[in-house]
């Protein structure tokens, strides 16, 4: 579960950038 959190955050940051 905790592995999914950084993945989602990374995806959002990548989408924003």
Curated annotation (Swiss-Prot):
Highest taxon above the source species: Eukaryota
Ion transport among keywords: no
Subcellular location: Secreted
GO cellular-component term (any): extracellular region
Modification type Lysine amide: residues: 17
Keyword terms of this UniProt record: Amidation, Secreted
Tissue and organ distribution: Expressed by the venom gland.
Main location: secreted
Note: The primary structure of the mature peptide is identical to that of Antimicrobial peptide 6 from Tityus costatus (AC Q5G8B3) and ToAP4 from Tityus obscurus (AC A0A1E1WVR9).
Function: Antimicrobial peptide with low to moderate activity against most of clinically relevant Gram-positive and Gram-negative microbial pathogens (E.coli (DSM 787); MIC=200 ug/mL, K.pneumoniae (ATCC BAA 1705); MIC>40 ug/mL,0 A.baumannii (DSM 30008); MIC=100 ug/mL, S.aureus (ATCC 43300); MIC=25 ug/mL, S.epidermidis (DSM 28319); MIC=100 ug/mL, E.faecalis (MF 06036); MIC=100 ug/mL, E.faecium (NCTC 12201); MIC=50 ug/mL, C.difficile (DSM 27147); MIC=50 ug/mL, C.difficile (ATCC BAA 1382); MIC=50 ug/mL, and P.aeruginosa (DSM 50071); MIC>400 ug/mL).
Family affiliation: Belongs to the non-disulfide-bridged peptide (NDBP) superfamily. Short antimicrobial peptide (group 4) family.
Name the record gives this protein: Peptide TtAP-3
Organism encoding this protein: Tityus trinitatis (Trinidad thick-tailed scorpion)
């Amino acid at each position: 579960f905790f592995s999914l959190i950084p993945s989602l955050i990374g995806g959002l940051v990548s989408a924003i950038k």
